[in-house]
Structure formats: C-alpha cells, structure tokens
Regions:
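Structural motif
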Residues: 2-5, 67-68, 130-133
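Glycine/GP-enriched mid-protein hinge/lid loop-to-helix segment characteristic of carbohydrate kinases
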Residues: 31-124, 135
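ATP-binding/phosphotransfer module of carbohydrate and carboxylate kinases, centering on a glycine-rich
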Residues: 33-36, 56, 98-189
Length: 189
C-alpha cells in the first residue's frame, strides 16, 4: 500500500490525506484481519524505487519532486539507495517551515521555494519532476528556481513520466524486496 504521508516501519505516522490512519499499524491490522502479508510505505518512496531500479541514478544524489494544487513531496536517491530518514520523513517538504499561500495562484512560487530548499540542502545532480494535477506549470517552476539559485547549484531537470503508474510499479518492487526478506527470515539465511 502506498500512502501519502510519513510511514515508519509500517506505521502511518502522519498523513494529511488520510488522518484516520495516523499512528496506526495498517499492515499489522490488515495482516491480522485477512491473513495476508501487507507492506505499506510512503507513495514517493515507492515511486522513487522505480527510478532507483530502472535508471542510471546509482551514483550521486537524485531528487524526485511531485507537486500539485494541494500537495508536494520528494523522494531522494543517494548512491543507489532510497533515503527514508530515521522516522520515514525524508522528503516530506511540507515540514519545511515556509509561508503557505492562501491562494492557488501562488502555488508554483511556493513549490519553487520548497524545491530550492531541497536543492540547497541535498545538492542533487538531477531533479525529476512529476505533475500531480493538470495545468501545473513546470516550466515556470524551473524558471523560478533558475532565476533565484546560483548556476553551480542547479541540477539537471527532467519531467517524470506518470507518478501514479510509477507508484504501482514501485509497489511491485517493494513487494519483491519484502518477500525476499521474509523468505530469508523464515529460512534463517
């Protein structure tokens, strides 16, 4: 299961999209109720696994940034590994303390500031950008970043394919890893 929000060791810690799941071990509850192995992770961490596995992003730092009219977030690949952070909150750009705009017209500028903060902190070689909603102006987003940051900080910008498709593909990768880990534990490898 891919969830928008912070997920740590199978527990949804904080999800604005699904607040009723906060602090619940969803995987454990579903396992107990249906007898199925359930894996749960952050949606961007899941999608980032696709880029990690099927691209040449094994060296250096790559940031995947997804943004829309009401949400934004990022996934981070560092030297071939997806960074989740100590509490699963790596990439949760909503935690960066910036002014939140009241009107939708400021959304691009707001997302630009958040992405600039990530670029300044992580200094990635590339940023892959997903548009979560129709009508988002990625050219404007990139233009704002280029106008405000020093040229040596600017990464290569790429447009992501389809965020939701990458989430589904990423779930298969997470399941594959989970099954292998479960087998190793059961067989004492």
């Amino acid at each position: 299961i891919a969830v928008s929000g912070v997920v740590c060791k199978g527990v949804v810690m904080d999800s604005a999209a699904f607040p009723s799941l906060n602090h619940i071990d969803v995987a454990k509850r579903l396992n107990e109720k249906f007898g199925l192995t359930v894996l749960i992770d952050n949606d961007l961490h899941v999608a980032t696994n696709v880029a990690r596995k099927y691209s040449n992003y094994q060296d250096g730092i790559t940031v995947l940034y997804a943004y829309g009219k009401r949400k934004s977030g990022s996934g981070i690949i560092a030297n071939g590994e997806v960074l989740c952070g100590a509490s699963g909150a790596a990439g949760e750009v909503e935690n960066i303390p910036l002014h939140t705009p009241d009107i939708e017209s400021e959304r691009i500028a707001f997302c630009s500031e958040r992405l600039q903060a990530i670029i300044a902190l992580m200094n990635p070689g590339r940023v892959v950008i997903y548009e979560l909603d129709e009508g988002m102006d990625t050219d404007k987003l990139i233009g704002l970043i280029k106008s405000k940051m020093k040229p040596y900080l600017l990464p290569e910008f790429k447009l992501g394919r389809d965020f939701f498709e990458d989430c589904f593909l990423g779930l298969s990768i997470v399941c594959e890893v989970g099954i292998k880990q479960s087998l190793r534990e059961r067989l004492d490898f």
